[in-house]
A protein has these predicted regions:
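Positively charged n-region of N-terminal signal peptides that target proteins for export
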Residues: 1-4
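Short amphipathic alpha-helical "recognition" segments used for binding
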Residues: 6-7, 157
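Bacterial N-terminal signal peptides
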Residues: 7-17
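GH16 jelly-roll
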Residues: 22-282
Length: 282
């Protein structure tokens, strides 16, 4: 009888162990509960005209915490570009004036993670030209061999609003990415709820040794097997998603993907309720 009970106990333990292994433990989070400047121990800011020929000038003044939210605000502006040089190599330095400002926050050098679950609750602006994003990048290699995960992008594709969930890695050509992209027409969400854009939603990434899975309100938008995400020759055939990634939150305007900016919609607010990182613990 004792042997039977022991065998039953061992079998039950063996059955329960895989279930326990799937439990998620909160590793760190930012709930944005303190009014004022975002936590310098977690977040840094980009500055200036940065990427994708976007129209906004990034600056820290356009992001703050208030009433339990991180607020990123895009504004109209009109002032000289302090980095202006008419013959500069970088496109941003060739712009004489700053017409819009916004903010991009990132955790590079402060908080990164390898595998796990990331959840971000946010309310996004959807006016013309808005290009909000939740994304991650790797360190130690130049883009795209560092790897990029777009947990959320919103912009217009051929003038039609879309939510995007993408993964990118390096090819055999410098600065040329291989993309696994899922574009979901915004109408897919607003048909279910006409007030979708006025509400907060949860974007989630589940990332392990086998795949990256991207969700919106528990709906799977894209699943990318890591067996497919091997860099080309520039990245020495490494897999960027076997290394840590850091987080970026930004509100871009116009540029290569954002589309025509609606100047009557300003200021635009991108509001983030929380960022949470979980890992599986045995």
């Amino acid at each position: 009888m004792k042997k039977s009970l022991l065998a039953l106990a061992i079998g039950l333990f063996a059955w329960l162990t895989p279930l326990c292994a799937q439990e998620w433990t909160l590793v760190w989070s930012d709930e944005f509960n303190t009014d004022g400047r975002p936590d310098d121990a977690i977040w840094s800011f980009e500055q200036g005209f940065v990427r994708n020929h976007e129209d906004q000038w990034y600056q820290p003044d356009n992001a703050w915490q208030q009433d339990g939210l991180l607020i990123i605000e895009a504004r109209r502006d009109d002032r000289p570009n302090p980095t202006y040089r008419p013959n500069a190599r970088h496109w941003g330095a060739r712009r004489e004036r700053i017409s819009y400002t916004s903010a991009c926050l990132h955790t590079r050098g402060k908080r990164d993670f390898l595998y796990g679950r990331m959840e971000v609750s946010a309310r996004i602006p959807t006016a013309g030209g808005a290009w909000p994003a939740i994304w991650t990048l790797g360190s130690g290699m130049e883009w795209p061999s560092c790897g990029e995960i777009d947990v959320m992008e919103y912009y217009r594709v051929n003038s039609v609003p879309h939510i995007l969930a993408n993964v990118a890695w390096g090819s055999d050509r410098r600065y040329q990415a291989v993309w696994n992209t899922r574009r979901v027409p915004f109408k897919h969400f607003t048909d279910k709820d006409k007030n979708w854009a006025q509400q907060f939603h949860v974007w989630r990434m589940d990332w392990d040794e086998q795949s990256i899975r991207l969700y919106l309100d528990d709906e799977l938008l894209n699943e990318v097997p890591l067996i497919t995400t091997v860099n080309g020759t520039i990245g020495q055939h490494t897999n960027p998603f076997n290394s840590p990634q850091y987080i970026l939150l930004n509100l871009a305007l116009g540029g290569d993907n954002g589309g025509t900016i609606d100047d009557n919609a300003f200021p635009l607010r991108y509001e983030i309720d929380y960022v949470r990182i979980y890992q599986q613990r045995p």
